[in-house]
Amino acid sequence: VANDVETTPSAAFVKAAIRDMKAYLKKKGLSTPVGYADNDDMHIRMNLINYFNCGDKDSRADFYGVNIYRWCGDTADFKTSGYEDVTKNMTDYTIPSVLTEYGCNLVRPRTFPELKSLYGSDMGNTFSGGIMYEYSEEDNKYGIVKVNYGDSKVEKNDDYDNLKKALKEAKPKTIKIGDYKPSGKDSVCPKPSDTWHVKSEVLPPTPSSARCKCMMDSLGCTFKSENLSADEGKAVGEAVGHICGQTSCSEISYDTVKGNYGNFVACDPTQRSAWAVNKNYLNQNKAKCEVKGADTKTVSSPKQEDQAVCLKEKDDVGNAGSPSSNTGDSNSSGGGSSKTDSSDKEESGSESGSSSKNSSSTMLSMQPLATLLASAAALFYLF
């Protein structure tokens, strides 16, 4: 997830995943909304807010969540806590906004004074409620009950009763569907900058297992096993880093700032690494197929002679195949030659080979979200 300036390139892949999830759900006849939740970083907040609600409607988030822990204790208020600023950021937003996490625990027991604003006039016209973090008490001390796993009994703490009281006192204003007249404006996509390392108009390609398998079937030099050990993976990573430092690996690379995504960038790390090893094999006129620390093999007659054919394979959502935005080199493994341009130094937001940024996208499906909210409401109604 994009948690700071340096990790903003991950936003492109998260938005692509939203696009693909929505397309898949649509094909299955489902209309479950898919949203995104940010971590309330002041340096990238507005770029994220705008990015996930701009451009192609099929790629936009269906709702936007903010994980916020600013309102700490009863001495803070709507203005001093920073909630006012967050609310202003979402004014005129065209998709629902939710506090996907709230409940600062710097002052305990928590009394949840922010609920008066969240469900009152301060925020009620902008936010569609929120989710308190969290139910069970863990090491981080955010829970409202203590649980012993294997025991069905729970022990409520003061936070539980305080949250129950705050929710009971909340008086959210309802509105009839006929009176709902949205006045929001579509967001403008952010441009690449020192704090935003993404070309917003271009998204990574939808993964295609068939395309990646076809590519693997075209290689004349590859690994003996598709499942590399940890030691092999480390050795391969170093080898691919060296290879892609000497020659263009644009087919397995991406540059989010320029909006370039290789045709095989969505393949798994082993497949992308095999592509690079094969590229090196071709560059050496098939003289050597080896990676120190990993078992490799040569294939005298690959099943697929031309990688360009692989680009016609359907993606995993079922869409017809097409080349990615990258215009990098696509080579045949059997007997073709490969262009060996030296790669440009990578800018922030670019990556190649088998090394990939470990970022987990924070996407939410509204269906479980609605279930959670309903369960919470039932919980406090009953107890």
PLM feature segments, named:
Residues 5-120, 153-156, 181-193, 198:
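Noncatalytic carbohydrate-binding groove/subsite architecture in carbohydrate-active enzymes
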Residues 13-16, 20, 85, 113, ...:
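Extracytoplasmic/secreted proteins, especially bacterial periplasmic and envelope-associated proteins
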Residues 141-153, 190-218, 238:
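Glycan-binding loop/region signatures in secreted carbohydrate-active enzymes
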Residues 158-204, 297-326:
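A recurrent domain-boundary module in secreted/ectodomain proteins
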Residues 201-343, 349:
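Secreted/extracellular ectodomain signature
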Residues 357-383:
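Cleavable C-terminal sorting propeptides in eukaryotic secreted/cell-surface proteins
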